[in-house]
Amino acid sequence: MQGWVREEGHCNTGAAGVDVSKHELVVALAGASTVMRFSNDTAGHGELCRRMSKAQRQDGRLRVGLEASGGYERKIAATLRKAGLEVIVFQPAQVRAYAHYLGQRAKTDPIDARLIALCTAAYQGQTRQVDPRIAQLAEHLTYIEQVEQDIVRFKTRLDGFTSGRFKTFIEADIKRLKQRRAAAIRALVKALREHPDLGQRLDLVAGIDGIGERTALALVIRMPELGSMTREQAASLAGLAPFDVQSGKMDRIRHIQGGRTRVRRSIYAAALPAAFKWNPAIINLYQRLMAKGRSHKQALVACARKLVIYANTVLQRGTPWIKTTQNQ
């Protein structure tokens, strides 16, 4: 297998891009005119790590960028990190935005690999340090989320039948899935509590009125950065921070965008019962916003954002939630 060929007039920026598919990895170095291909399996991962390590020894620090590909990228990302390489996993929207910036319309695996390499070279943010314990727990949580999606699908399917016989079958399926979900949650909590520090974080978050065990799991596992950031950063990471839309005389209503979808979905689901029953401070916030003319959805988003801020605060302080009717 031949190595990378550098383009004349270009230098390596210390960045590589990996286009990940189910069976193949297409890899490009920033400033290289060629790409290399590896199988997306243990043997291919080992060969890629050797190549990347060699490139790092030759050129100094090397960052490897990958695009999230429905989970196909997880194994190679973990392998590269284990080999001591700095890895950045981009969301597809980030890579597409960079392609628009470059005016790149064509799309092939080699083009995507080069694009990811350039995106990696231009990236100026901090590289997220991944806790291997969290990665394993996240896969367990993903399974629970998929079971929950199956329950929703079966409930929708139930509404489309009038035959009692078929309704009975579907109701049995729903019951079975709910039992599986409950068992999976119990197993996840048990696995998480094997790590005392994570168990403590779970207790602190679950102790907030309105945040149940299921939502607390999502926050602890999907947002391990909680407790080490500002309240504004926490809200933005969850995709619950409102962004201004203003230019010249145009001044539109602020809206939320981006962030971690799964976290936002979990915390938004918790916001409704919190705003109507469980958390006096959130109930007060919801009623105050509605009195000011905000829509139900706007008020709920604000309540969800406040719950994330509460979680960030208790983890920062390391002290349990104190019940209050006042907005904190």
Where are these regions (language model features)?
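Phosphate-backbone recognition surface of nucleic-acid-processing proteins
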Residues: 213, 218-292, 296, 323, ...
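Gly/Thr-rich phosphate-binding beta-strand-loop-beta motif of the actin/hexokinase/Hsp70
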Residues: 4-30, 116, 218
